Structures are given as C-alpha cells and as structure tokens.
Amino acid sequence: TGVDSSRGMLDIFDRKIMEHTLKNVKTLHLDVEAGAALPGPYHLVVSSMTLHHIRDTAVLFHHFHEALLPSGLVCIADLDSENGLFHSDPTGTFHNGFDRAEFQRVLENAGFSHVTASTAAEIIKPVDRLGDHRFTVFLITGRKDVSK
C-alpha cells in the first residue's frame, strides 16, 4: 500500500503500478499529519525521500510503529542535514535534512529497537549558480519488538 497525502503523488504512483502491471500494490490517500491512522498491519514500512516534507516526524514514527506487526521493520531513506540547497523551491519542505543521531533517538522513542543508520546514496545535483553540490542520503532501519 502506497500512502500519501498528495493526490498528485499518488497519481504518479498509480501510473507506475499500471506500467509495471503490479497486481499486489495499491495506493491510499491519507493525511497522517491530520490524525488519520495508517491501516495495517504491515510487515514493512518504507519511506524514501519524503520525511523532510513532514512537519512532525515523531508523531509519524508512532503511527508507523502502531501499523507494524510484531517484528515488523521500518526503513527510512532521507537527506542528511544540509543547508537548504537541495530544494530550489522550499515550499512544503519542513526540514533541511536530518541529523542521523537525533533521528535514531526519535525512532527509539517511538518504540523501535535495533535502530541502525548508514549512508545509502549520494546525490549530485546542480544548485543555482554554485554548480554541482553533493548531498548524502542515509538509510535508517528499526524493528518493532515481538512483545509490543
């Protein structure tokens, strides 16, 4: 299930589902920030390059934890802290990346264990008149304990 509060993003995802003839993937328009609960239960929650567009990530991580089955995994890829250059138009961007150590603590506070972080990728992109700039993307994973 692909969940987003943006109908436009879900339309793009729906097109990709059709292009690849995926039969076991669906989309769901849901605004978790407005208090809507994720359906679930899920074995895995994945977020890729979206959390810097979420105001309160701590609340979202609690939603992720609640939606997971015991032993379920959360995998999050997003920007490391940066100086605001990644988005040329910052509309809808609430974080200029994240400090990994702080992000790990927020996941642990939401109830996740075995939280680890690593560098997943580097993005080189042109930044206005500054030329190419390097941005790193982290991957943080955590597990919902069996007892929870």
What kind of region is each of these model predictions?
Residues 1-35:
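Class I SAM-dependent methyltransferase SAM/SAH-binding core
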Residues 3, 75-136, 141:
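C-terminal alpha-helical "lid/dimerization" subdomain adjacent to the S-adenosyl-L-methionine
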Residues 37-40:
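Glycine-rich phosphate-binding loop signature in dinucleotide/nucleotide-binding domains
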Residues 43:
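Conserved acidic residues
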Residues 46:
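A conserved beta-strand element that flanks and buttresses the S-adenosyl-L-methionine
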Residues 49-50:
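Short catalytic micro-motifs in class I SAM-dependent methyltransferases
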Residues 58-73:
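A short glycine-rich, Lys/Arg-flanked "PGG" loop and its adjoining helix->strand segment in the class I
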Residues 140-148:
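C-terminal lobe and adjacent flexible extensions of AdoMet/dcAdoMet transferase-like proteins
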